[in-house]
């Protein structure tokens, strides 16, 4: 299951615009860019632990909502249920994109993961954490703080990984372009020598 081509292209263009380092003139290490692994171990470990933590967060949130449901105003009941449903759906998509983008070094998927984390998931969990009208219980605050720490770390780690991936892809592109030009020059020399012989 892959992202549709228009979405992949837009996320790829967005990633190149945001994460490319225009000040760099060459690769940072002596290894060839084809052999360098740019997926992030820290990000992958965070995604792994987040995968096991999220069901715990979900069950705790549902239990706490059940306990305080009768004292919440009607509009907060609707808002909290909607936010928990949104977080659940977004988290499933976000973790999938994070795994695929990081392990397979796919920039559009990792950019989608980063955008979902930063623009949707983080504001929703901060709403649950800091809204005084929700009368958060101590367990709720604890699980929301841990989830927020996961998200904050993943946003930073994904940004750094994306920068590294985009820079590596740019180096690969320039090396392939250089190889093509070198091959074309070699062909031109051979043609000139053949013409001169004739």
From Swiss-Prot:
Domain of life, source organism: Eukaryota
Primary location: membrane
Membrane topology: Multi-pass membrane protein
Coiled-coil segments: none
Keywords, sorted A to Z: Cell membrane, Cell projection, Ciliopathy, Cilium, Cilium biogenesis/degradation, Glycoprotein, Membrane, Transmembrane, Transmembrane helix
Subcellular location: Cell projection, Cilium membrane
Role description: Transmembrane component of the tectonic-like complex, a complex localized at the transition zone of primary cilia and acting as a barrier that prevents diffusion of transmembrane proteins between the cilia and plasma membranes. Required for ciliogenesis and sonic hedgehog/SHH signaling.
PANTHER family referenced in this protein's UniProt entry, alphabetically: GEO07735P1-RELATED-RELATED, TRANSMEMBRANE PROTEIN 17
Family: Belongs to the TMEM17 family.
Quaternary context: Part of the tectonic-like complex (also named B9 complex).
Protein name: Transmembrane protein 17
Naturally occurring in which organism (per UniProt): Homo sapiens (Human)
